[in-house]
Amino acid sequence: MELKSYVREIADFPKKGVSYKDITPLLLDPEAMRLAVKLFMKNLPHGKIDKVVGIESRGFFFATMLAEKLNAGFIPVRKPGKLPHRTHKENYDLEYGSDSLEIHEDAIKKGEKVLLHDDVLATGGTAAATCKLIEKCGGEIVQCNFLVELEFLKGVDKLKGYDVCSLIKYS
């Protein structure tokens, strides 16, 4: 089974010139989802992972599944104003604009081992901002993993010093 065959490309979405990678066909297929989780688990570094951070909103899908498999807590990183408790905030640039993200201040204890997950690594801005949020909370990032990586945007360059794993790559 080739996971890449479950990703649909949508031209000029969300704006002209962007080739959007739609993972919903993969989400519709239970076997494809199971394979993705199995491959993520196989590529994790050894050792205990305390928390899995998922980035709003498509990062939540696999982050929750990985948290369950790892017997770890799940932490949502969300857009501003969506979390009810005190938060840390980080601004970032993305492929088609700019935004900011928030995490609950008390979501991670100092020294906890954290896995970061998102659906797509594009420019790296979202993931880099989330790494900063995790570190503000005192977490140690063990890996940043992604379902899809757009290698031509060189997002991995913003994640220097972190272990990065992507299951599907577009050159």
UniProtKB/Swiss-Prot annotation:
Chief location category: cytoplasm
Pathway listed: Purine metabolism; AMP biosynthesis via salvage pathway; AMP from adenine: step 1/1
Pfam families attached to this UniProt entry: Pribosyltran
Keywords, comma-separated and alphabetical: Cytoplasm, Glycosyltransferase, Purine salvage, Transferase
Reaction(s) the record says it catalyses: AMP + diphosphate = 5-phospho-alpha-D-ribose 1-diphosphate + adenine
Alphabetized CDD domains for the sequence: PRTases_typeI
GO BP term, example: purine ribonucleoside salvage
Cellular component annotations (GO), alphabetically ordered: cytoplasm
Enzyme class: transferase
Single GO term (MF): adenine binding
Subcellular location: Cytoplasm
InterPro entries xref list: Ade_phspho_trans, PRibTrfase_dom, PRTase-like, UPRTase/APRTase
SUPFAM superfamilies: PRTase-like (SSF53271)
EC number: 2.4.2.7
Function, in words: Catalyzes a salvage reaction resulting in the formation of AMP, that is energically less costly than de novo synthesis.
Subunit relationships: Homodimer.
PANTHER family linked to this entry: ADENINE PHOSPHORIBOSYLTRANSFERASE
Family the UniProt entry places it in: Belongs to the purine/pyrimidine phosphoribosyltransferase family.
NCBIfam families: apt (TIGR01090), PRK02304.1-3 (NF002634), PRK02304.1-5 (NF002636)
Name of the protein: Adenine phosphoribosyltransferase
Organism the protein comes from: Christiangramia forsetii (strain DSM 17595 / CGMCC 1.15422 / KT0803) (Gramella forsetii)
Gene symbol of the encoding locus: apt
